[in-house]
Curated annotation (Swiss-Prot):
Transmembrane segments: 20-42, 62-84, 91-113, 117-136, 148-170, 190-209, 240-262, 277-299, 306-325
HAMAP family assigned: BtuC
Quaternary structure (record): The complex is composed of two ATP-binding proteins (BtuD), two transmembrane proteins (BtuC) and a solute-binding protein (BtuF).
The keyword Transmembrane helix belongs to this UniProt entry's keyword annotation: yes
An annotated GO BP: cobalamin transport
UniProt cross-references to InterPro entries, sorted A to Z: ABC_BtuC-like (IPR037294), ABC_transptr_BtuC (IPR023691), ABC_transptr_permease_BtuC (IPR000522)
Name of the gene encoding the protein in the UniProt record: btuC
Entry similarity comment: Belongs to the binding-protein-dependent transport system permease family. FecCD subfamily.
Keywords: Cell inner membrane, Cell membrane, Membrane, Transmembrane, Transmembrane helix, Transport
UniProt-recorded name of the protein: Vitamin B12 import system permease protein BtuC
């Protein structure tokens, strides 16, 4: 009876968290659509100008922020299980850097502006290559947590330096303006660019429903196989899905760090490690955090707009340092 009560209490906590996060997300969405240089009531815009600002600027960037935040948070939660590393995250491990590197190479290689689908495929390929490197090292070499983080940071620095050199030697103003975008920004996202969400949303929903399989994977590879799980196929499927989500996120909003690290880790600490609840709640919280960060980036400075990646890094970096100290990594 005591065990049943404990399980029931834990499920109640998860359900209450879903409810609270959903309410906060609705409030944040209304605030994000309303606030700016011109205050607009989303349900009753006054005039053609307010209508255009709402539908062509604020709504696309809000949808992009929600999708990117959800994708990065869910990807971070999956990576932490796949790598057996509570500090794994697409930005910290350099996966986002690989996506941005592939995207910049594509922009330099093509004589025309690539379509949103082509940019997503290029970013996905870069993310996939870096993910395979990290997964291969973590499984075959059995590197420690500290060394894996260092390898990821090194890969991120390497890709970042190549991107910086490329922009420095570029005479194209549009390419140089991309440097601001690569710092993380959903400003200027159009409805055409959001067409990639036709691929991203179904994949994200599928990923959020794989929590039970991840719970089995956390028991260990041998135990998971004994319970009928095809571990190798599932691992490859997760790698491809994470690469697609990270690649699409970078293609839409540039490199936005720490969302995939902070959200899953804090949820595990406060609510537990049941992935069937953790994955969808991480996605919701990730979307909420990035929508809130994007709203703050527009109002912190009166005459300028900060990249949303700067806001998330400001929030996430101190938490990351605290997590490193807490895990006693030498």
């Amino acid at each position: 009876m005591l065990l049943n009560d404990l399980i029931q209490r834990q499920q109640t906590r998860w359900k209450a968290s879903f409810l609270v996060v959903s309410i906060l997300m609705v409030a944040t969405c209304i605030l994000s659509l309303s606030i700016g240089e011109m205050w607009i009531l989303p349900w009753s815009p006054d005039g053609a100008l307010e209508q255009q600002l709402l539908t062509q600027l604020r709504m696309p960037r809000l949808i992009a922020a929600l999708a990117i935040g959800a994708s990065l948070a869910a990807s971070g939660a999956v990576l932490q299980v796949l790598l057996g590393n509570p500090l794994a995250e697409p930005g910290v491990l350099g996966i986002s850097g690989g996506a941005s590197l592939a995207l910049v190479i594509l922009l330099f290689a093509l004589p025309f502006v690539p379509t949103p689908l082509l940019t997503m495929l290029a970013a996905m390929l870069g993310a996939l290559i870096f993910t395979l490197i990290l997964v291969g090292l973590s499984r075959r070499r059995k590197v420690s947590t500290a060394r894996l983080l260092l390898i990821g940071v090194a890969l991120g620095i390497l890709s970042g330096s190549v991107v910086t050199w490329a922009f420095y030697f570029s005479d194209d103003l549009n390419l140089r303006q991309l440097m601001y975008w690569l710092m993380g920004s959903v400003g200027g996202v159009s409805w055409q660019q959001l067409s990639v969400l036709l691929f991203v949303v179904p994949v994200l929903v599928w990923l959020c429903l794989q929590g039970k399989k991840l719970d089995l994977l956390m028991l260990g590879e041998i135990q998971a196989k004994q319970l009928g799980l095809d571990v190798a196929a599932l691992r490859w499927r997760f790698i491809l899905i994470v690469s697609l989500l990270v690649g699409a996120s970078v293609a839409l909003g540039g490199v936005i760090g720490f969302v995939g690290l902070v959200i899953p880790h804090l949820l595990r600490m406060s609510l537990g490690a049941e992935n069937r609840y953790l994955l969808p709640l991480s996605a919701l919280c990730g979307g909420l955090l990035l929508a809130l960060a994007d709203t703050l980036s527009r109002v912190i400075l009166p005459s300028a707009e900060l990249p949303v990646g700067v806001v998330t890094t400001t929030i996430g970096a101190p938490i990351f340092v605290w997590m490193l100290l807490r895990s006693h990594i030498d």
